[in-house]
């Protein structure tokens, strides 16, 4: 599917149950994440436009294109993640940012959950208590994954080089 086809499918109700396409791709991106809800919202397409013009009617939402989404999440949507990879904040702050983005990731121990409802024990979703979301893995799992990712990034030559290389792949 092209970006334009996804935009249409995510805003058009189809079929007898009036269902529409909602979360798409490897990272299960919802309409607000890809396109924003209102003008001025942070969103993937707006972030990407800082680096390249995208013709939505031609650009496929393929695996290669979707590989750019981690950079968006790290830099724009949950900046503490990229700051950790650059050595400018703690792994706990990065893990907290992950928990805010993905309900299945537990908030780190002693961090507040959404609206300050609870203090996490390291196994609670940031959205605990909303009746819909629960963590599927502990904050320690996220912390370990972030540490491993940072090592890979550092071994590659640092965050800036990873970003540059990833963005260059889109232009090929």
Locate the predicted segments by residue.
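Short, structural beta-strand-to-alpha-helix junction motif
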Residues: 1-18, 30
